[in-house]
Every structure is written in C-alpha cells, then in structure tokens.
C-alpha cells in the first residue's frame, strides 16, 4: 500500500478533520472558518483525496501573522486555510506513525507523551552526573531557513512514495500572503501549520543521530538544544565542531553571539535556569519568566480599566495567568518568590482595585465592617474607621495593616456570588504559593 493511500484513507482523513475542528484556530486567506468544515468536507472530500493521489492538490498560500516574542521581537506565523490544515494533519498523522519509533529519546518537542518538564529533568540528570559545562546552542531563524531539497532528501530515506513527497513539497512551496501580495517560499517550514512540527523534528533528527554517534549528553526541544560536558575545554571543542556540522550538513546557521559555553547557573533552557543546592542541581524560573508573569498581571490590573470591571471577571483572568504559569514552572524551586514576593505583591494590587471600586469612604467602611463580621475578626471598629477615612492615596491606603488584615489571602480566595446564576459561585483569587505546594506534593510528583 502506497503511503499516499494511508494519508487519504477514510479513518485517517476523518481523524484529521476532527482534530482540526477541535483545535479551532484562525482562518486562512480564504476566510473559511473551522465551523464551515462540517458542511464543506462531506461535499468535497472525495475530490480532495483524488487530487492528492494524482499529484494535483495545490495548497493555498499561508496567511502571514506576527506574534510577539519575549525579547520584544516578532515571530512570523503562517496560517493555512482550514482545508489545507486537514490535509496537513492527515499527512502529519501518517508521518508520525513512521518516524515516532525512530526519533531519539533525547528529543522532547512536538512529540506525544513528551514534555518540557521531561526535558528539564533530563538536563538535571546530566548536571547531577557531573556534566556541569553547558553548550547553549541557538540556530538562527531555524523554521525560516530549513532547506527544502535537503528536507525532501531526508524524507526520501523513509518515504518511498512520489505522491506523498510531492504533496509535502507543495506545502513547503505554497507561498506566503502578506498585505495582499503573495511571495514565494524558497526555504523554511512556516510555523502555524499542522505539518510543521513533524517536519522540523525529521530535519533535526539527523542532528540527534550525529550527537548520539559522538556519545554526547544532550537535550533537544524543537530547535532549542543544550549539550552537557565535563570540562570547559571539551565544551569549546564541541561547540565548534557541532556548529560546523550544522552549517555543512544541514545548511543551518548557528548564531555566533547567542551560542555559548556557560556554567549551569548562566544557562537558560525552556524558561528555566539552574542552581546548586545541598541536594544537588535544581531548576527555577528565569528572572525574565518572572517579569513576564508580573507584566501580564499588571495588564489585567491597570487601575482605570480594572476599576470598571467586575472583580469576578478580574479574578478569573488573574487565575488563568497564575495557574498557567505555576503549572508550567512548578517543577522549579520558587517557594520564596511565590510566598514572599509575588503573592503579597499581586494581593496588594488586587486590594487597590477592590478599594477603588468601593470609591467612597463610607462604602469602604461599610464593606470592611461586613468582612469583619464574616471572618469574626477582633479588630476594632475604630481601627476600621481610621483605615476607611484616611486621606492616603489608594495604593498607600491598601498598605495599611487593617486593610491588609481584613482583605487577607483567605478572604480574597472566598468564592464570589454569580449575579447571572445564583446557584453558582465564581472562584476567588487563587493563592499562587498554595497552588505551588499542592503541585509539589508527593501525590502529584
């Protein structure tokens, strides 16, 4: 059975269709939404399959969009049409079945049942085994510079089917529409398509095999990879030889300024850096990762905008950001940061928004008395009155011990009434430190 027949096989194609529908996503240049697939695909599926088998399928150019990168620059994405996404997904599913058993155990990106956490734990294993010099590699614009001919040549080693190779090349050459104009794509695998992850892994699997043949300790997540060695001299030698190999064999350019030999404490990998405790090497979020979290919180709590929004909405938005960040970074050491720095900081900013929404001193006084009654506090009514009637600005007022005590973490975490559905309550503010502790508990580890 030729491989192209596996791609267009009914079950595989329907699985691809359902996958695209589940993942939603933006429309391509034809502006067709995912919702239209249920009507479009039954009418056109047979024609699409026949055109693929006859090497006549012509993908549309991808729609260029840009998303911000942590360093302030922008990452270009190519959004295929929803029909092209179905065909790409069907192709990717077949390629995954072929290549997944062949991929290196040191590759963690874009693979089933593999994660960033596993990659970080592998790096820690190397460090704790004594490989304490790190070669941080940076491939310049990897996804934009993959050589098409080289990729097809690599694919041909496992894919002996001209129709499948023709289909993949047609996606690589489909072009990019930006500002109403279509430009040709002579190199690169546009990020944003369903097939891009598997193709990028197939290309860099050659690197994995080369590093394994040299018996090097390495971890790769997509185009982000580190090599771990025992001495600085070995690290310098490895950096030079692997850089030459990448440029000569895979035609990829290694960044001379960003690729460097460092100690683990200066290494940055997948948002983590490393430090040595009495227990050995551990990981923790980088300062840049913390700054990104705090920036997102500030954007939600911009005072003028936040003061006009329901607190239940603000808490929902904050909880999404905090849960997402803590869930990702919880394998790292950050108890002190969450308990003593971030937690108190975010709660103070929330108190400012709450008090500002109350506006009048009389309203502040009334609500603080109500909270006192609920939590059965022994704080005096006079202290509450003084805190309510102060002439301090919002920010300094919310730093007063009385308001801090009454609007404490437990109070902020209380469920809030849902005005549209009285039978349901909306969650209060999640405690980042408590969430971290729950994820770090032995049951969760």
Which residues does each PLM region occupy?
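Non-catalytic, polymerase-adjacent accessory regions of viral genome-replication enzymes
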Residues: 1-42
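A conserved non-catalytic segment of reverse transcriptases
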Residues: 173, 249-314, 321-323
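Conserved polymerase palm-domain catalytic core
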Residues: 44, 51-66, 70, 102-266
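Extended C-terminal regions of large enzymes
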Residues: 345, 358-445
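Conserved phosphate/pyrophosphate-binding and hydrolysis machinery centered on Walker-type P-loop NTPases
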Residues: 6, 30-38, 80, 109, ...
